[in-house]
């Protein structure tokens, strides 16, 4: 993900947490706030309770990959994805389905967009 698509600064994270809205499912929480950018910006937070650094980085890589894949269909808002316990056990397809579900609940995806389900 390009740097311009990332939320990196602490004050940006805090603004999204304080002023934004949240939506959650069992594996992920999303806080989102309307931004003044031409594209979405995403921050990813994976707590130490999920496992060691290798495990946490693997979860972040999966989330980043899903966001890049869905990038053309995301609305221009700033958001933070927080991984909950159990997210470390998910394979890529499950991460994609769970993120799609919570992004849809938060109304951050374009209307009518659905992911293809593999059988």
UniProtKB/Swiss-Prot annotation:
As recorded in UniProt, coiled-coil segments are: none
Which residues constitute the signal peptide according to the record? Answer: none
Describe the reaction catalysed, as an equation: Endonucleolytic cleavage of RNA, removing 5'-extranucleotides from tRNA precursor
Give the keywords, sorted. Answer: Endonuclease, Hydrolase, Nuclease, RNA-binding, tRNA processing
| GO molecular function list | 3'-tRNA processing endoribonuclease activity; ribonuclease P activity; tRNA binding
Q: Please state the Enzyme Commission number of this protein.
A: 3.1.26.5
Please give the GO cellular component terms listed in this UniProt entry. ribonuclease P complex
The protein's matches in InterPro entries, at most eight in alphabetical order, are given as: Ribosomal_Su5_D2-typ_SF, Ribsml_uS5_D2-typ_fold_subgr, RNase_P, RNase_P_CS
| Keyword hit for Signal | no
Q: Which GO terms describe its biological process?
A: tRNA 5'-leader removal
Q: How does it assemble?
A: Consists of a catalytic RNA component (M1 or rnpB) and a protein subunit.
Biological role stated in the UniProt entry: RNaseP catalyzes the removal of the 5'-leader sequence from pre-tRNA to produce the mature 5'-terminus. It can also cleave other RNA substrates such as 4.5S RNA. The protein component plays an auxiliary but essential role in vivo by binding to the 5'-leader sequence and broadening the substrate specificity of the ribozyme.
Q: Which HAMAP family match?
A: RNase_P
Family that this chain belongs to = Belongs to the RnpA family.
Q: What is this protein called?
A: Ribonuclease P protein component
